[in-house]
């Protein structure tokens, strides 16, 4: 019996970070997501190194994309992702600040949500190379893609 069939929502998240050993943090996040019964990981993108935007006086970011399945509703999924950000040391000091781990919900099934706490699809996804390029590479690499540094 395929556990994917039990999870009804397909979700694409963007991950990014520029504090500490970002690659190691991403690897640990992926292990946590794989162990978490609320999620089934489907595919990950290659990583992309990007310059910061907004606040420019900081290190470049590593970014990637993860596609997974879940039964959580969008708000519960958001809370779960925020808990993972906190687990890996995310501090919210100011907008576009350096961070250990940033998790953005890019798409949640084909839902459109616009609330104070949650906007899906992510409002800036189409303007961000940090989303577009890994998404294209993930889609071109087939099902066996692994999150890896370029």
Identify the role of each PLM range:
Residues 1, 51-61, 72-150:
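Flexible, gly/pro- and Lys/Arg-enriched active-site loops
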Residues 3-15, 19-93, 109-110:
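Nucleotide and nucleotide-moiety/phosphate-recognizing core
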């Amino acid at each position: 019996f395929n556990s994917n069939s039990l999870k009804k929502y397909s979700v694409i998240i963007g991950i990014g970070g520029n504090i500490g050993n970002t690659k190691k943090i991403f690897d640990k996040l992926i292990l946590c997501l794989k162990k978490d019964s609320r999620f089934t990981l489907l595919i990950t993108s290659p990583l992309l190194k990007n310059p910061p935007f907004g606040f420019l006086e900081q290190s470049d970011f590593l970014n990637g994309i993860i596609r997974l399945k879940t039964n959580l509703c969008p708000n519960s999924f958001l809370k779960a992702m925020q808990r993972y950000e906190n687990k890996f040391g995310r501090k919210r000091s100011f907008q576009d600040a350096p961070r250990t781990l940033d998790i953005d919900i890019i798409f949640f099934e084909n839902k459109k949500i616009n609330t104070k706490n949650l906007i899906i699809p992510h409002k800036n996804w189409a303007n961000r190379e940090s989303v577009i390029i890994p998404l294209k590479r993930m889609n071109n690499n087939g099902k066996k893609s692994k999150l890896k540094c370029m």
